[in-house]
């Protein structure tokens, strides 16, 4: 439907030998539509994730705006994240962008927090919370945010 808008959010935290495959599709088949996708994950131990995202703009989907991003925080050297964003654009008047990032905890940031009397464990917890914060802000329900936060703390432990 012309003028439709969608926001997709995903949060994941893998550990052990978990393997998670995520496939997302933002299909623009009408004019003046907007899609906004943000998936964030943290990985521990020997876990692995694969995210494949696709924004499709059909020929009649003019003046659309599509965005997708996948960001991964590696908490162990043995964890692995593959991130494969994609665009299939058949229209000629669109704004479509994608982003992907895979990074590790910043040891200087952890050192700074520890120099202020914060234990390494709490410093890691704070850094992971900060990583997920932009996504958590997208969740309108306090109870859901609280439950997700509790699970994140459990997984970090």
Locate the predicted segments by residue.
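Conserved beta-strand/loop scaffold segments within soluble protein domains that form the structured core
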Residues: 1-111, 115-118, 132, 139-157
